[in-house]
Amino acid sequence: MNKMKTLFITLLCMGAGTLSAQTADSTQTSPWTKEGFAGLKLTQVSLTNWAAGGDNSVAFDLQGTYQINYKKGKHLWNNRIELAYGLNKTGDDGTRKANDKIYLNTNYGYAIAKSWYASAFATFQTQFSPGYDYSVNKDVAISEFMAPAYLTTGLGFTYDPGKIFTVVLSPAAWRGTFVLNDRLSDEVAYG
């Protein structure tokens, strides 16, 4: 019985060491890091015989973020996508958009000093669905997918000391606003 325990513990330790070694090797050889998260928030407020007043409401908010980054030698390349969409219904009002975002970012850098990179970046931002100004006219959209859309590009420097934070300094940048809806473009709503 004692020999069985010793054999079992020995095999268990060897297996754990092998698994640990495999994990360490795979993370050390890849210059790519990937991470992301997704979240869903649901809320409801129901008021019955509530003396202080208020409105019943129900809402949801769906969000996701994903990053894939490359860092090897003198090269740094960070990429990020953020998507979010949420709706809210309060009282007798119809369902309204509470959150709406499509955001893409890429930043490439070449090392010029410790933690400093000469860099170029591009950012794109728009939304999924139409938006409305409910105080004016709740039936006429004031924004929609690609109306507006923003593209920002720039040259500058990236400071990346590690995993805690990154700072991008861009003294030379350009921002373009695209409105792919003729009515919104004719109203000069976005520049």
Protein language model features and the residues they cover:
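Bacterial Sec-dependent N-terminal signal peptides
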Residues: 1-26
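Transmembrane beta-strand segments of Gram-negative outer membrane beta-barrel proteins
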Residues: 28-44, 75-77
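Residues on the lipid-exposed face of transmembrane beta-strands in outer-membrane beta-barrel proteins
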Residues: 36, 40-42, 62-70, 104-110, ...
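Transmembrane beta-strands of outer-membrane beta-barrel pores
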Residues: 40-46, 72-74, 83-89, 124-130, ...
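Extracellular loop and loop/strand-boundary signature of outer-membrane beta-barrel proteins
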Residues: 49-54, 89-94, 137-143, 189-191
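Outer-membrane beta-barrel transmembrane domain signature
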Residues: 170, 174-191
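Residues that define the transmembrane beta-barrel architecture of outer-membrane proteins
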Residues: 56-62, 98-102, 147-151
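Repeated loop/turn-to-beta-strand initiation elements of outer-membrane beta-barrel proteins
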Residues: 74-77, 115-118, 164-167
